[in-house]
Amino acid sequence: MKTISKLICALAVASLTASSALPAEDIHVAKVGIDHYRGKWLEIGRTPMFLTNGCVAGYSTYSRGKTPNEVAVEDGCRLGSPRGRLKTIHGTGAIADFGAAKAKMRVRYPLFIIFNYWVRYEAPDGSWFISTTPDMSNLWIYSRQVPTKARLKQMVNKASAIGYDGRKLEFPAH
């Protein structure tokens, strides 16, 4: 319970720095199918932040929500090593552009913490994607499996191509 409380506090702090309002200028988002929001995605790369200090083997698991545009979200990681203690938090996502690209999801976590995640790129085969906050201050690379070194380089290059400084990313162990 102590770890969950720390995680909730960290999310609260992080949400103050993450954009919760959508910018006036709409930056390109990918077009994804509803299956994008099903199953487990491994967090391959991310922008460092207080919330994820000490977290490795991160993941997000999506499952069907109560309505067609709702997604049940479980975010988790292991503390210190891929075999460390599991830390999780649950939220409810709403796909904001459900009738269109299905790429903008707003997730509500406990204590009124809200994050907006926009899918900026999805690989043609659907095996990995890049998600950011609307203002691109935070970026995550997710994959269905741990990538090869060549694939990881491709992922980082794509992050740079969409306007993010790939040198800012960290790549926690899996």
How would you describe each model-predicted region?
Residues 8-17:
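Bacterial N-terminal signal peptides
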Residues 19-174:
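A beta-rich soluble binding module of mature secreted/lumenal proteins
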